[in-house]
Amino acid sequence: MNSGYPLANDLQGSMKNTNYKDWLAMCENNQQYGVNPAAINSSSVSTALKVAGAILKFVNPPAGTVLTVLSAVLPILWPTNTPTPERVWNDFMTNTGNLIDQTVTAYVRTDANAKMTVVKDYLDQYTTKFNTWKREPNNQSYRTAVITQFNLTSAKLRETAVYFSNLVGYELLLLPIYAQVANFNLLLIRDGLINAQEWSLARSAGDQLYNTMVQYTKEYIAHSITWYNKGLDVLRNKSNGQWITFNDYKREMTIQVLDILALFASYDPRRYPADKIDNTKLSKTEFTREIYTALVESPSSKSIAALEAALTRDVHLFTWLKRVDFWTNTIYQDLRFLSANKIGFSYTNSSAMQESGIYGSSGFGSNLTHQIQLNSNVYKTSITDTSSPSNRVTKMDFYKIDGTLASYNSNITPTPEGLRTTFFGFSTNENTPNQPTVNDYTHILSYIKTDVIDYNSNRVSFAWTHKIVDPNNQIYTDAITQVPAVKSNFLNATAKVIKGPGHTGGDLVALTSNGTLSGRMEIQCKTSIFNDPTRSYGLRIRYAANSPIVLNVSYVLQGVSRGTTISTESTFSRPNNIIPTDLKYEEFRYKDPFDAIVPMRLSSNQLITIAIQPLNMTSNNQVIIDRIEIIPITQSVLDETENQNLESEREVVNALFTNDAKDALNIGTTDYDIDQAANLVECISEELYPKEKMLLLDEVKNAKQLSQSRNVLQNGDFESATLGWTTSDNITIQEDDPIFKGHYLHMSGARDIDGTIFPTYIFQKIDESKLKPYTRYLVRGFVGSSKDVELVVSRYGEEIDAIMNVPADLNYLYPSTFDCEGSNRCETSAVPANIGNTSDMLYSCQYDTGKKHVVCQDSHQFSFTIDTGALDTNENIGVWVMFKISSPDGYASLDNLEVIEEGPIDGEALSRVKHMEKKWNDQMEAKRSETQQAYDVAKQAIDALFTNVQDEALQFDTTLAQIQYAEYLVQSIPYVYNDWLSDVPGMNYDIYVELDARVAQARYLYDTRNIIKNGDFTQGVMGWHVTGNADVQQIDGVSVLVLSNWSAGVSQNVHLQHNHGYVLRVIAKKEGPGNGYVTLMDCEENQEKLTFTSCEEGYITKTVDVFPDTDRVRIEIGETEGSFYIESIELICMNE
């Protein structure tokens, strides 16, 4: 074979030894040029294809053929018709060594073969004992034998896989063998899990085995992908690297390694339950990846990167080849060669024809000469081209599975010498690996690209997809149907195909957002033919996401649309928000049908369109879809699900407690966990498990009682309305939200009254008597949704101050469907499956002791700690727990609030709380001293206002200014109200109320004894007759009558008891020239006058005794010039 043309057969070389008789035979067969098929694919590739094909056939295995999948694989890897049993493993090593230009040493080859011989012996013993037991499953000795051999074989397979992965310098060369050993190991573990109950591996041992399977799957995939990519990097970066070698490596390692990895996820019997009649049956896996064969000159004049772009496709939705157009250079009859091509293709279940661009040269001298309609899949192709000069293509044949042949022929005349033929295809026949027949082909043609070398020479590449891919996305009636996301037939502008990580069998679909439009994908599937009117199915999604995202999942059947919303978990994170093409196995999750399901009732033989689109995505959000899975909901599936649910719910309930006696709760068990566990238990079928349900309900009720007894916060679940809490008016206790079990707290936004904000709040003080000294307490709860709600927890200050903004994103778990009996949680599958770990699932907000304030975004669970120091029941510091909303558009729904003991503190925590305690005591001492000083001054001022300690009368010379000053002193008393709430009493509230009441009494007595109405002008000029420019102004917080012009006048007529003496007292000041005056005049024209001038600085108090001769007098205020300010006017009877 010419090393420059690894896919071609040289005509001259094939004819060197022909005689005249051979030549005549060739002429009789009209064979004008050599057709000696080239073995372009190694025998190891054919072997790998047979292994994958054998496993894929177990989607619908022939009845009674084998009892375990391993039995079908072993004869392929250790064929009986070969004199050297290790031939297959030698082929794997030799082929890989050729691909990466590495020689297999005799030691490595011998050692690897020895290891695999031991593996074969263990597997043979296992399959023999398994089949013996399977035929007599009640035979105890057979059961013991198979269990023992299972354990021994599993250990040996694991040991062998680890050995191959750690053989330094040969990790890549041995990778295909490693993949096969990993495959053995996982298929074996699958047997153990399927037969766990009969082998007494149920529950704890079975769970351990399942965890082992998950861990091994993760490790086997990670190792394989790492070394596959290292091989690519080595070939890509070689200084003299050729694309043909690079492509050979990608193609053959995809078949030998990556395709095997793509099967692993389907081995999980808990995700893909084994069929009860035939437990060898597997869920169908589809390989949507494309691999390439090509005719390329060597050495090529283009780089690996350039040829990769020219001869392969960028990522795309899965397509089906429908038409090929060919251009031919037609300028000269003897130079008629292929010059370009174009492709017509369609997406799955789409009748619309899509067209590619033109590949090659279709310009001057080239004409469209062929349009080949492909109404049947092509399983083999051949190219005829010249060998010197090379790559001038004259003919191309397409072998179709319907038995017909389609051809391109440039019709060059005369026929050039030195033609050669290259065959392309994939066969499970090791003797003709690149020349499949209609009976043994594994791939179909999906695309062709032509790339120009020079005027008449071209490179040609063929893209191939595995024949396992279903053209209709047929939905099985008796097995889980997997439909890769790249088989969508519609993506909108913000949905895109991205490169797969290598272990998913193909590429993926990323749903992103530009800030306004979220990505949308649509997949069309076709239901099978069945006799029932309808059948029930559930829809599951395998995905990865970089944050919790709500998805709208819907389907359209016969014009009717149905759907729901579900939510993803956050499964991965990448720097700079790049879209990952290296997702790990463990970064994928399933949205399960029995958690949040799109229930579907489908009719026979109908097309159904399934759509997925995120809601309210930000530009940073990403959801990456691997595949959707459609699960037939049969009675056996439901029964199995009920059984699994019972076991899961038993585990959830057991996880609430610390021991089997169930007399103490785990510290991590929240009150919310207990409520949700109760919801789970209530959904257990009473028909199937009445006793189990009753026992579990009793245990959950016990857990609730234990939760309430350890909670030092009173009424944290609001089942007794607001008992124990102090609240503002706009607090309500509701029970209409299925997120919560029973009552919950609803807080509305703060009230805005004429620009003044009145916060919404609720708080509770935990008395000292309920606490323990030097102890840490957990403060936690559950937020359904909130905006701008502030949590403050305090003992020695604001130890906890958190703002919680939590979106209302749990509706998919808890649809608002109520009937007369309450929320129908069971039918809607409202309860999260992993409720025992809600802190992880719902992104618990925890306190950072290094920060004074924190903001919690998207955290439904919150959990903080607060420490106590020494206790003082007299001081009764306690612990304050408060929720507050200070913005009018804020809101919150809360429940399951608890403060529970975590345990005694020591070390640094103990030192810290003692420091805080001392600091708080020092601050309190300073506050008490400050309070005492303020109190003494205010009390002294108030005492001076009255004639006795009973505050029955004012001193005669008590003025309004003195009362106002006393009021000022009272208002200056500190710490009257709570630091966080301006209308909640603080430490000095009681003494403030006492003194404020005495000031109010003084003011009342003052107003009562003043015969003049509104003499302090607090009611403006009410009661006064005003002319000219006079009004009441607020000056330094005091109402002052101001006269600004000589023409202004203010007067009031007053009724007196004559024959009594009175005192007229005025506090006022004059500014500017002229005088200000206040005159009292009776009806006998007797008058008294108080005069003020600007020579008198500030406000002056002046009095005059008056003895009116009549019972009516007139008070008149005026000025001659300038401004006159009157603070108060009193007329007091001398008998008072």
UniProtKB/Swiss-Prot annotation:
Comment on protein domains: The toxic segment of the protein is located in the N-terminus; it is about 65 kDa in size. The first 83 residues are not necessary for toxicity and presumably include the signal sequence. An active fragment (residues 84-641) has 3 domains; domain I is an alpha-helical bundle of five helices, domain II is a beta-prism of three antiparallel beta-sheets and domain III is a beta-sandwich of two antiparallel beta-sheets. Domains II and II pack on top of each other and against the long side of domain I.
Tissue specificity annotation: Host (A.gambiae) larval midgut; binds to host brush border membranes, probably to cadherin-AgCad1 (Cad1, also called BT-R3).
Q: Where does this protein come from, organism-wise?
A: Bacillus thuringiensis subsp. israelensis
Q: Which domain of life is it from?
A: Bacteria
Q: Which cofactor does it need?
A: Mg(2+)
The chain's coiled-coil residues are none
Protein's UniProt name: Pesticidal crystal protein Cry4B protoxin
Annotated stretches, region: Domain I = 84-282
Q: How is it modified after translation?
A: Treatment of recombinant protein with A.aegypti 3rd instar larvae midgut extract for 1 hour yields major bands of 72 and 45 kDa, the combined proteins are toxic to mosquitoes. Longer digestion, which removes the 72 kDa protein, yields a non-toxic preparation. Proteolysis by yields a 65 kDa toxic protein and 48 and 17 kDa fragments which are not toxic.
